[in-house]
Every structure is written in C-alpha cells, then in structure tokens.
C-alpha cells in the first residue's frame, strides 16, 4: 500500500539486536539531512530529566551529531537497510541527567555525561510482542516492551 500510494518502498524494522560497529544512517525528514556513522556502544541505562531508557544506542562522533528536530528519525543499517532504532536525544551542553543532557549509567551504577553524545532506542523488541494477527500484545509471554504504568 505504501509503495502504491507514495511511490517509495517501506522500510523494514529489524527483528534482531544490532551490534556495536554497525554502520548506520540517521535520516532526518524534518531537516532533510542524513547523518552517517557507526554504533559506538550500548548504554545499560540512559537518563534524561524524568525519563529512563535501557540498552540505548550511542553513536560514534564525528558523523552523527544530530540536532534538535531529529528526534523520531529512523536509525537505518547501511548494510541491511533495516530500521534498527529511533533517534531520540543528545547531550547538548555537557549537563548530567537533565533535559537535553542525558547521562549514562553503567552496570555498576556509575554516572557519566558526554557533551555532544547522541543516542537512539532499539526497535527489535516490537517483534517479541506481536501476536498471531501481527498486533502488539504487551501481555504476550516474552514481550520485551515496557508496559504503561
């Protein structure tokens, strides 16, 4: 339907956890700009203001110095052309755990912040929650998505 209506092929969401070193492109429709780099590492916990994410993707620098307005942009594997995540934040001024200044929390609970670091969230977990009708069921056994509080 997407191809027929808009003349473009839809992107596929990956069903596997990405790996560090994967070449990626963050494609911003808002700014009509592509940012290309690799996955630097996975952050056990990323905190920003009142939000917290697990297993976040951190991008290498230079290359993916994403800016305001790129949140929600797909993170695409250069090799497979699959969407592996969604771009969502970056540390703008070097602050720690505040809005627009996310911080990283490692496995030992140590908190660090890196000015200019940018991050995204993985999508493979969606597949763990799909039922037989391809609908998301958060109560499905093995579902890895967070449930609303």
Where are these regions (language model features)?
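Low-complexity, Gly/Ser/Thr/Pro-rich intrinsically disordered linker/tail segments
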Residues: 113-149
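Short glycine/Trp-rich loop-beta-loop segment that forms part of the substrate-binding cleft
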Residues: 10-39
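Active-site region of chymotrypsin-like
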Residues: 2-10, 33-128
């Amino acid at each position: 339907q997407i191809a027929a209506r808009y003349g473009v092929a839809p992107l596929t969401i990956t069903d596997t956890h990405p790996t560090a070193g994967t070449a990626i492109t963050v494609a911003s429709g808002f700014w009509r700009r592509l940012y290309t780099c690799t996955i630097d590492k996975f952050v056990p916990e990323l905190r920003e203001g009142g939000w917290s994410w697990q297993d976040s993707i951190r991008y290498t620098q230079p290359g993916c110095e994403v800016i305001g307005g790129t949140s929600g942009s797909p993170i695409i594997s250069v090799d497979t052309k699959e969407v592996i995540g969604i771009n969502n934040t970056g540390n703008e001024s070097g602050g720690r755990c505040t809005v627009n200044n996310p911080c990283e929390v490692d496995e030992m609970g140590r908190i660090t912040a890196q000015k200019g670091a940018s991050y995204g969230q993985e999508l493979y977990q969606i597949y763990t929650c799909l039922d037989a009708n391809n609908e998301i069921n958060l109560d499905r056994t093995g579902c890895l998505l967070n449930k609303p509080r």
